[in-house]
Amino acid sequence: MVKDYDFSGWATKNNLLCSDGRTILKDAFKSDDGVTVPLVWNHQHNEPDNVLGHALLENRDDGVYAYCKLNDTEKGKTTKELIKHGDISALSIYANQLKQQGGKVIHGSIREVSVVLAGANPGAFIDSVICHNDESDEEAVI
């Protein structure tokens, strides 16, 4: 299990209809297991300042899980506070090299995970926040 992260959650869940009309099938992103990708604000990957940190991807039976680490930048700190207070709880992926059968995604490559106000996949959400402080060990807030 990954130990050095600020929060974690489902980057995408399998077998759920996304708002773009696609459904991600099991193991569609299996080749991304163990890959680290940029963590971005709202899919705005055209500016370096919008990169908030990185996400380590883990392919699971239910989808792709992400362990996310925020940078010590102003945007990273702000995002950490928004997540900590529950103001933002959704994740989303940007993927390419998609192979589809109709609207079902059978393969692709995840290029970034985004912290978003509302995700396309209804199962993509932050489910654990780690509170780092000087007074105690890390504690999970779920």
Label the predicted regions.
Residues V35-E47, L91:
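Short conserved beta-strand and strand-loop elements enriched in small hydrophobics
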Residues G21-R22, G34, N46, D62, ...:
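Intrinsic-disorder/low-complexity loop/linker signature
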Residues V2-G34:
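N-terminal "first-domain core" detector
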Residues D4-G9, N15-L16, P38, H54-I142:
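Residue microenvironments linked to proteolytic maturation
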Residues I24-L25, N46, D72-E74:
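Short, surface-exposed beta-strand-loop junctions and turns on beta-sheet-rich folds
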Residues H45, L52-A55:
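Polyanion/phosphate-binding surface patch
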Residues C18, D49-V51:
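Amphipathic alpha-helical interaction segments
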